[in-house]
Amino acid sequence: MDWYYPNYTNDMWRILGLCFFGDKLRFVDEAHKTYRLDELKRFLEEVGIAIYDTCLRVRRTTGTASDKDLEVVERADLDGLLRALPQCRGVVAAGQLATSLFTDHYGIDARTMRMGDHCDFTFDGRTVSLYRQPSSSRAFPMRLEQKATYYKSMFEDLGLMASWRPDIL
């Protein structure tokens, strides 16, 4: 896998296009059924969005990518990741497995969190917010525009929308 969310049917990059540009195809290369990775990477760096996995290695127990069919072989160093990102104020764990691994690691009780909610936790003396957002997978039954509304609200809450200028890309 070359990069995050490589599956053309996954909506993560369409969600970001809608949130920041009002254009779900902003990062989509329709002709090649892929994404404009160079532009996407520049955008993420400019805005201050980091992406990482909660698992470094997984084993697929069936032919699907469903969380229930993944066996964790090696977890990521979440503490090391947050230490490497001292300005990080918010985290989205996309998917049930990632959420479970993250909340278990930090002792967060996320059972009562509804879609769009966040809960704060303290890490190395700073407050970090864990956001519960809809999965970007098309298997998650929600319209793309509705998913983008949740994500945009989070980006606004974290101050990323206010500092973003679309003309810089």
Question: Where in this protein do the model-derived segments appear?
Answer:
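Secondary-structure boundary/capping signal
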Residues: 24-25, 89-90, 110
